[in-house]
C-alpha cells in the first residue's frame, strides 16, 4: 500500500490557529470535566435527595406564622446590632430582660454569634419574619449534610449515612428547631462537624488541629453549655 500523500491528509484544526491554542482551556479540554458531572451526581445521589427533601420540609411556609415569644426577644436583640454594632438589651425605646440590664446595657446573657448571624440576614433581606428565620433554616440544610458527612467518615457506609441523615431530616423536633429564629439549630450542625474533625486524630496521617479548633471556638461562642458537654465526652473517650 502506498503512503498517503500529505496533500490528501485532512487537518482537524485550521492552520490559522496560533501555536498556543493547544495550551489553552479549549472545548476538548473542558469536555472530560463536563463528562464527570453524571458520575458525580450518581455517586452523591443519596445526599442530593436528602438536601432537596430537607429543603422542602424546612422552607415550606417558613414565614407563615409570626415570631413566637423567644424568637421575638432574640430577634429584637439582633436588631440592636444594626443600630449599635453590638447586642444590647434596649434600642432606646423597648427593653428585653430589664433585670439583666447591666454593663451599660450590653447584652451578656448569651454568646453573640447567633445574633450577629441573624442581624446579617436582617440587614440584607430586611426586618421581617422570613429573614429572621432564614439563617437557621439554612443551617438546618447544612446539618443534614453534616450528619451525613460525619457518619460516612466514621462508618464508610453510604447506606448508614443516608439513614442517619434521613432520621434527622424527618425529626419533628429538629425541623421545629431549624424553623425557629433562635440559636438552637446551630449546635445541631456544629456537633457532627466537631466529631468529624475529632476522629481524624486517630488517622495515620499527620493531624491538622485547625478545623477542630475553629469549630470549637464557633461552638463555644454559640452555646457554651452544649459545647462543654461535648468536650467532656470527647475527653472521656480519649
Which sequence ranges carry the predicted segments?
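Perimembrane helix-loop-helix junctions
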Residues: 29, 197-211, 228-238
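Transmembrane signal-anchor helices characteristic of membrane glycosylation enzymes that use polyprenol
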Residues: 42-71, 77, 83-86
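Transmembrane-helix signature of polytopic, membrane-embedded enzymes
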Residues: 49-50, 147-170, 189
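Membrane-proximal lumenal/periplasmic loop motifs of glycosylation machinery
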Residues: 62-69, 83-115, 123-130
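Membrane-interface alpha helices of multi-pass inner-membrane proteins
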Residues: 102, 164, 177, 208-224
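Transmembrane-helix motifs of polytopic, lipid-linked glycan transferases
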Residues: 134-155, 193
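Membrane-interface transmembrane helices that cradle and orient dolichyl/undecaprenyl
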Residues: 153-158, 192-212, 219
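Short acidic/glycine- and proline-prone juxtamembrane loop motifs at membrane-interface regions
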Residues: 179-184
